[in-house]
Curated annotation (Swiss-Prot):
Family: Belongs to the HrcA family.
Lineage summary: Bacteria, Bacillati, Cyanobacteriota, Cyanophyceae, Gloeobacterales
One of the GO biological process terms: negative regulation of DNA-templated transcription
Organism: Gloeobacter violaceus (strain ATCC 29082 / PCC 7421)
Encoding gene per record: hrcA
Keyword Repressor: yes
Protein name: Heat-inducible transcription repressor HrcA
Keywords for the protein's UniProt record, in alphabetical order: Repressor, Stress response, Transcription, Transcription regulation
Transcription keyword on record: yes
């Protein structure tokens, strides 16, 4: 189970007073969605400072680009840079919240299930826990290994192939047997294939690997080559497979009251969701860190008013898929980070769990 950490930007040298006031301003805006003034902070927080002192400090934070006024007469709200400092420097790892969410995931997703049901359930629960749009990518088949394979003769030169992977996938398909006498050798062939294929990644099973298997079944090389090709095809998830849940959550936020923003974000989440996959793809990861992209740090236009919190889940220490939540930049970051960390940990734990293949 991975420890909590997240990528951070270069730190801005803020003294304790500025940190305290920036933290309070961001937290108040996250909670209320209303611009924050010095009077509000004086009433809500026991700073031991006058309203004028707080107002001056907020003006300095604005001059540094961390706060801004949406209207001349309004209070201040955080900029993307202000949120960045808040995430990188002003909040602590939400350890207790992570533990609570891990428990919720284990309780609600505790039963052993197939991969698709697991990911669908995890996505729905992640949306509920975070209050955001939840995104989970399916494991990439190139990282998947065969755990068990069984070929069953069903008559008339046909066989049923059942395969179980270490990513909780179970698939079956029909296959022609090239020679009638092969049906009598299936038990021996099954033992041979399980010995040769077990725990080998599918992308390692190329033509050379099939040739190298050799053994007593060397005259079935063409059959083995066809079998491997079918395995790679049936275990390959659809391109850009991404599970999404909680779209309605983001539409409840005042940031998306404008019809243009609603249309853009719904178009992205419901019609063009394949564009989201690469943003949280495990190929973007170099460590087990939480990644937080805020506002303009996101490359897609509809996400310029959003924050994306994401991480990776692993299978046999290899990153195979990703978990993320998407919401407005006015995001409860501690809760978003905790939910993503907990979901990533849970998927890692389930993927690594040892069990009898036939129970899947």
């Amino acid at each position: 189970m991975s420890s909590f950490s997240f990528e951070s930007s270069a730190r801005l040298p803020l003294n304790p007073r500025f940190k305290q006031i920036l933290h309070a301003t961001v937290k108040s805006y996250i909670d209320t969605a209303e611009p924050v003034g010095s009077k509000m902070l004086t009433q809500q927080y026991n700073f031991g400072l006058s309203s004028a002192t707080i107002r001056n400090a907020m003006a300095v934070l604005e001059s540094w680009g961390l706060l801004f006024q949406p209207h001349t007469s309004a209070g201040r709200i955080p900029s993307d840079s202000g949120y960045r400092v808040y995430v990188d420097e002003l909040i602590s790892p939400p350890t207790e919240l992570i533990q609570q969410m891990r428990a919720a995931l284990a309780e609600n997703l505790g039963e052993r299930q197939d991969l698709e049901s697991l990911l669908q359930g995890a996505t729905r629960l992640l949306a509920t826990l975070s209050g955001c749009v939840a995104l989970i990518t399916a494991p990439q088949s190139v990282f998947v290994s065969v755990r068990h394979l069984q070929i069953v003769h069903i008559g008339e030169g046909r066989a049923l192939v059942i395969v179980v992977t270490d990513a909780l996938q179970t698939r079956s398909f029909l296959l022609d047997l090239p020679q009638p006498e092969m049906a009598e050798q299936l038990e021996t062939l099954n033992n041979f294939l399980n010995l040769q294929l077990q725990n080998r990644r599918l992308d390692d099973l190329n033509a050379a690997a099939v040739e190298a298997m050799g053994g007593e079944f060397h005259w079935y090389t063409d059959f083995l080559r066809g079998l491997i090709a079918l395995l790679q095809r049936v275990l390959q998830p659809p391109t850009g497979q991404l599970y999404v849940s909680g779209v309605g959550e983001i539409l409840k936020q005042p940031e998306f009251a404008e019809p243009e923003r609603i249309q853009a974000i719904v178009q992205l989440l419901e019609v063009e969701r394949e564009r989201l996959g690469p943003l949280i793809s495990p190929t973007q990861r170099h460590s087990r860190q939480i990644v937080v992209r805020i506002g303009a740090e996101n490359p897609l236009g509809p996400m310029q008013f959003c924050s994306l919190v994401s991480s990776t889940y692993y299978l046999n220490e290899v990153p195979v898929g990703s978990v993320g939540v998407l919401g407005p930049t006015r995001l409860p970051y501690d809760r978003a980070i905790a939910s993503v960390q907990a979901a990533s940990d849970h998927l890692c734990q389930v993927m690594q769990a040892e069990d009898e293949p036939h129970r899947w």
